[in-house]
Amino acid sequence: MNIPNSVVLWKDIHEISDKLCKYYGLSYSKIVPETRKQSRHFGECRPCQKCCSAAHVDERNCNEKILSIRIHHLNNPRKPLATSTILRTLAHELAHLRCWDHGKDHRAFEEELVNHMRELGYRIV
C-alpha cells in the first residue's frame, strides 16, 4: 500500500505534538494544514473562533487554539518541506501555547521544545 507522504507527515506531527503537550501540560484544539492565504508564514497559532468572537475573552487565554503548519512548498504542493523545517515550525507554534508573544521566554521555550524533540530521536538542524 502506497501511503502519501503528507499522511505520514501529519501522523508524525500529531504524534510529536501529543508527546510534547503531555510532557509540558500544553493543550490545543487541532492542527490543520496551512493554507495559501497564510503564505507569508510556515505556521500559525490562533485562538478558536469562539474566543475570537467573544468580546469578554482574552484571546491569549484560549485553551482551544488552532495550530496551522505548512508541510509542502507553496509553488510545488507535491514536494514536502524538509522535516527539520516542519519540526522547527511545530516547536515555534507549540511555544505560543505557553508564551503568546515572540519575546525572550517564547524563544527559550521554543528551544526547549526543539531539544526535547532531539531527545525523542528526531533530527532537527
Regions found by a protein language model. Give the residues of each.
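Walker B catalytic acidic pair
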Residues: E93
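Active-site-proximal or metal-binding-adjacent scaffold patches in catalytic folds
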Residues: M1-R88, L97-V125
